[in-house]
Amino acid sequence: MRKGIIITASILLAAGLLIFIGGLLLGGGMKPMQFETKTYPITEPVADIRLDTHRTDILILPSPDGTLLVSAAEAERIHHTVTVQDGTLTIETVDERTWIDMLLPTFDQQMIVYLPETSYRSLSAQCRTGNVEIAKDFTFRSIDINNSTGGVSCNASATGRIRIEASTGDIALENVKAEELWLVVSTGRIAVKGAEIQKGVLLTVSTGKLEIDGLSCESLTSTGSTGRVTLRNIDVEHALWIERSTGDVNFENVGAETITVHTETGDVTGTLRSAFYFVTETNTGKVRVPDTHSGGRCEITTSTGDIRIEPADAQNP
């Protein structure tokens, strides 16, 4: 009896809250936030750029007139602080909305950072909901992006490390150069098209696809739980290591000193440019690899799946 009373009271309370909110909306008591674009011209010299934002898309673009300018959509209770101290440009979102404000639909807004120079010391961004896009015109000493919900598209290069992490969203890089490359996605896709990396590459995808087309590096390590791996036109100076729980692994014109692939469920197929001696194991699948006994070690194991590897020149006699 007591349990039934509690359930009934909860239902009535929820219904009353919905009626109250609906009355505010229909009666004009809750007006949608009106956004307008505000600009922040920067005259101080800047070497480092730091962003801490949420519910806004970020674009890093070359300045059309040689000035450093921040343009952002703002409302009465959502605005930004833009400061420069010791050569660091800091942009932060200030969210002063009430809980009632947050019940209203608020579409992601856009922020554009126009940079006059092509070279800067560092770019770091902590984003919560929103996409990040960095144009190809820039080179940083380091790039460090952490995005909770949203994608990251980076075409800029770094003399040091590029590190990008996304909880839910895709990461895309094209024609970049860096000393090191770290890309981490919990749920999403990693796509790299054209990358020259001096040292190591670390690619982690918990759930999602990994697609690389055109990469040179010293070493390549990729781990993940679920998702297909496709590597095309890859040149690894030393070790290539891939580990997956579920998902196919496909090579197209891949070269390395040594290759190691471990997957629980999935096929491992494709063409390798280098000569290898093969060590293979599959519980319920077929194995077809070149009968070679020289070159580097290529170890491929899968519990459920086929292993089919050919030399790259076999498709182009």
Please give the residue ranges for each predicted region.
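Short linear S-[DN]-x-LW-Φ motif typified by the pepsin-like aspartic protease active-site region
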Residues: 26-94, 104-126, 131-146, 151-157, ...
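Hydrophobic membrane-insertion alpha-helices, especially the h-region
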Residues: 6-24
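Short, surface-exposed interaction patches in beta-rich subdomains
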Residues: 155-156, 162, 171-317
